[in-house]
Amino acid sequence: MAYIDQKHNTFWDDFAIALRDKIVFLNSTWGEIHASAHRFEDLSALAFDEAEEMIYFSDQTHQNGSIFALRRDDSTPIVVQRTGNDSVEGLAYDPLNRNLFWADMRQQKIFFSSVDTLATELPKVLVDLSGEGGQPDGIAVDICRRQLYWTNGNIKSASVERIGLDGKGRQTIISADIDMPRGIVVDQLSDRIFWVDNKVGIFFAIESARLDGSDRQVVVKGKHQDPKHLAINEDAIYWTDRMDKAVWSYPKPTYSQEVTNVTQAEPELAKPFSKEKAYGIVTRTGFYQRLQKDAHCASIVKKVKQQLNTRLNNRTHIRSAEGDRISQLEREHCLNGASFMSRGEFCICPVGFKGARCEISECHNYCVHGTCEISDAGFPKCYCQAEFYGERCEYHKCNGHCLNSGHCSMDKESDAMRCECRPNFGGERCEHNLTEQCAIYCQHPETQLPVSCLDFCEEWSNSNDTATITEYQTAGQCGPAPPVQGPLIIVIVLGLVTTSGLVALTVHGVRLIYKPKRPRIKKTFVVRKQARLNSSSDTPLTNRPLTTEQCEITIENCCNMNICETPCFDPKLVEQTFSSRDRKAPCVKEDKKILIHSMEDNLLS
């Protein structure tokens, strides 16, 4: 049900925090503007409609209702029917269909209803978790892709799930390594979800994933907190902590398709509340200005604007000349082509402008040293001058380049950086302390001194006081060291020679092991005297010699690969040679003539 109440002429700026018994509105610097809903006792969840500047909230124990609305152009409280015996833990709003969704942990269901028919129709059930023991806690609407996300806080089956706003396509996207998830939010700018997980014990975590549950990352991990709900805008993540009675903030990680860069920082205490616990939180995201050209959101933003204009035009009332003049003034109130919403009395700015009247350009004072343009996504983008860099061109390239108070300058043509060093410093970045380096040379008189150190060493030897040498910052590099000495060279040479010898022995041993053996030739020749001539029919088979007339010669390795270990002689030529030697002196050179030239051929013949 809804309860509408507003008595203030100024609405909240950037944040709204639900404490136990009131809603506090704060500006961008966390300064308190005012507080509302003082007649409530047990506030919990919040939801915000940026199209009509409407904030929705829930009270667990109010006697007249469970869900309420806060709008500034209504001053009379309106009470509608109570939703039932419920315990609303999470709220979410869809501006396209003007439906309000809430998670009822007591009934274990997720309900929804149109804000236009809350007083006349009963809410409908979108998801029923009672049969499976689920405990819906935080919920969030993906306006552009028409999905509803929720956290199941049952520690036995904890999960993060989603379903279409039409009730179809339920899907569990996170179910592993999750303990007790609480609040959840959809960031339309980065197309990711963020949720709080109360870990077992004293720990907690804030995690993130893509809309389908992939690319899961831990953004913040800490302890000794009791986080409940969270909100997100362009710059940071914010969550309520019931233990410390405060709101914490953390820099929003930047994601892209190529690079994921998670900012490494510590959570900051954004807003402490000394007496009351903080529960729900919502923040202004600039949805309608930021996403007018987004591929997924542009059509939704256009439809929401058209519906707002249609509802305003359908109002029938008598207009006088004074009324027409007031209407003209209202239209002129918004600058730079912005649209004026009379019901909420606010402006919807076009891409590239912001402010209450859309009077401030997004590029105003945005780029420090460069030119600014509005990107297709509706964000300011800087084109830096040659000497500067950074998201806003706020950093000079020479920052921190020259060390030890050196002066940095840049070449306009090549953009190269050069350093002019102070006396007694040198190097490309003035990283070398010549005083320290010369002191090292001075302590080793056997080394050759650089010319630049002669004067210093002479003065140093006279004073003989090394305590006056000051230590300066360096770039992580050492100065030139004294040259190596003779004994070190000898040791190095001996080591190289020994290593070479060991390598040679190893190679030779391997060759001996794996080299195939050469074949060995073993032949036997029978040598006998000349056959007897007593018979013309005598043959070697019929006229065998006596044992005293023959001998056997075994020849091994004869002419093996041209290496003759045992000389091989032709038996047919031996007798002729010996008979001729008897007539003249023996000649050693003639022995070569009777060597066997082709042993195998002679044997075959």
Curated annotation (Swiss-Prot):
Please list every transmembrane segment annotated in the UniProt record, as residue ranges: 487-507
Sorted alphabetically, the Gene Ontology BP terms of this entry are:
animal organ development; canonical Wnt signaling pathway; oogenesis; positive regulation of circadian sleep/wake cycle, sleep; spermatogenesis; system development; triglyceride homeostasis
Q: Where are the LDL-receptor class B repeats?
A: 53-97, 98-145, 146-190, 191-236
Cytoplasmic compartment ranges equal 508-605
Q: Where are the Extracellular topological domains?
A: 32-486
Q: Does the keyword Transmembrane apply?
A: yes
Cleaved signal peptide residues: 1-31
Enumerate the glycosylated residues.
27, 64, 85, 261, 314, 433, 464
Which UniProt keyword terms apply here? Cell membrane, Differentiation, Disulfide bond, EGF-like domain, Glycoprotein, Membrane, Oogenesis, Repeat, Signal, Spermatogenesis, Transmembrane, Transmembrane helix
GO cellular component annotations of the record: plasma membrane
Protein name according to UniProt: Protein cueball
In this protein, which residues make up the domain named EGF-like? 322-359, 394-431
Q: Which organism is it from?
A: Drosophila grimshawi (Hawaiian fruit fly)
Q: List the disulfide bonds.
A: 334-347, 349-358, 398-408, 402-419, 421-430
Annotated function: Has a role in spermatogenesis and oogenesis.
Annotated PANTHER family? PROTEIN CUEBALL (PTHR46513:SF42), VITELLOGENIN RECEPTOR-LIKE PROTEIN-RELATED-RELATED (PTHR46513)
What Pfam families does its record include?
A: Ldl_recept_b
Membrane topology annotation: Single-pass type I membrane protein
